[in-house]
Regions:
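Acidic-residue sensor for enzyme active/binding pockets
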Residues: 59, 80, 102
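Non-cysteine beta-strand/loop elements that form the S-adenosyl-L-methionine
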Residues: 74-80, 117-118
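Active-site beta-loop-alpha junctions enriched in small/polar residues
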Residues: 21-23, 50-52, 80-84, 120-123
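Short, basic/glycine-rich phosphate-binding loops at helix/coil junctions
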Residues: 12, 80-85, 114
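Glycine/proline-rich, positively charged
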Residues: 86-127
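N-terminal binding-site loop/beta-alpha segment at the start of enzyme catalytic domains
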Residues: 1-76
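Generic preference for well-ordered secondary structure
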Residues: 1-2, 46, 83, 87-90
């Protein structure tokens, strides 16, 4: 698979990324592992997730695959923060305190101490 550099960061990403929005929700752990295995065997290394996907379950599935299906250093993981659903209501909060707290939770679910790309999931006109 063709690889691309992410700006001047030195990070090398597969041109195609593996989206995981349904993992832990519509896609069970075994099917997710099969998808991930096929993606990696095809030369992919860029896995995209979010704290909101499956209420964190997508990140948990990826965390469970690290060390069993792939080595952490062999993939680039992107996740997102800033959107939560307290009491079932979509809330956007990009304050520093909220973002850092969400990053800590994502790292715990992903069972890693870093992510390669961390994104704001939605514009917050207040922060």
């Amino acid at each position: 698979m063709e690889m691309r550099r992410a700006g001047k960061s030195g990070l090398s990403l597969s041109r195609l990324g593996l989206g995981t929005m349904t993992w832990g929700r519509d896609t069970d752990t075994h099917e997710a592992a099969d998808q991930c295995r096929a993606f990696i065997e095809a030369g992919g290394n860029f896995i995209d997730t979010s704290a909101t996907y499956g209420d964190g379950d997508s990140e948990r599935v990826i965390g469970g695959l690290i060390g069993t299906l792939f080595k952490r250093e062999d993939v680039a993981i992107a996740t997102k923060a800033g959107v939560t659903f307290p009491a079932g209501v979509r809330t956007v909060n990009n304050s520093r305190q909220t973002l850092i707290a969400e990053l800590d939770k994502s790292l715990a679910r992903l069972e890693t101490d870093y992510v390669d790309i961390w994104q704001i999931h939605s514009w917050d006109p207040h922060n």
